[in-house]
From Swiss-Prot:
Keywords: RNA-binding, Transcription, Transcription antitermination, Transcription regulation. The lineage of its organism: Bacteria, Pseudomonadati, Dictyoglomota, Dictyoglomia, Dictyoglomales. It comes from Dictyoglomus thermophilum (strain ATCC 35947 / DSM 3960 / H-6-12). GO terms for biological process: DNA-templated transcription termination; transcription antitermination. This is Transcription antitermination protein NusB. InterPro entries: NusB-like_sf (IPR035926), NusB_fam (IPR011605), NusB_RsmB_TIM44 (IPR006027). Coiled coil: none annotated. One of its GO terms (molecular function) is RNA binding. GO terms for cellular component: cytosol. It comes from the Bacteria. Belongs to the NusB family. Involved in transcription antitermination. Required for transcription of ribosomal RNA (rRNA) genes. Binds specifically to the boxA antiterminator sequence of the ribosomal RNA (rrn) operons.
Length: 144
């Protein structure tokens, strides 16, 4: 399942990236097993639900980097990882961070992997504060 989960993350990242660029997206995870589909749909829904909160967290914990200055892929990889941490408490944060770093290295560059790693490690180190931000978050996500 872990290799399939990696492929699910890649597919969700592609959808988030397209959506971030204002493109229409077709959400279809039918090429995955039933468990993979469930994981992918839940991850995608979580990424949409927590997008504004994730952006706030990224802005708070990325030293000297404004969200809008980040590349769209890096920004969406970070959003995806934060959503995964909130949505799947059974997945160790170290696994989520590693998967995000691998996505950044594969789709952007080794430097992007280090960038994503640094921000996510900072978020994980400050997880109690991050959870308190989540508790104060009001979901204003429009219904699709």
């Amino acid at each position: 399942m872990s290799k399939e989960r990696t492929r699910c993350r890649e597919k969700v990242l592609q959808l988030l990236f397209q959506k971030d660029l204002g493109q229409e997206v077709e959400v279809d995870f039918s090429d995955f097993s039933p468990q993979g589909q469930a994981f992918a749909y839940r991850l995608y829904d979580g990424a949409l639900q927590y997008k504004d909160l994730a952006d706030s967290i990224i802005s708070r914990f990325s030293k000297n980097w404004k969200l809008e200055r980040m590349g769209a892929l890096e920004r969406n990889i970070l959003r995806l990882a934060i959503a995964e941490m909130f949505t799947f408490s059974d997945i160790p944060q170290a696994v989520t961070v590693n998967e995000a770093v691998e996505l950044a290295k594969k789709y952007v560059s080794p430097e992007a992997g280090r960038f994503v790693n640094g921000i996510l490690r900072n978020i994980v180190r400050n997880w109690e504060e991050v959870k308190s931000l989540k508790e104060g978050f009001v979901d204003v996500t429009p219904e699709n």
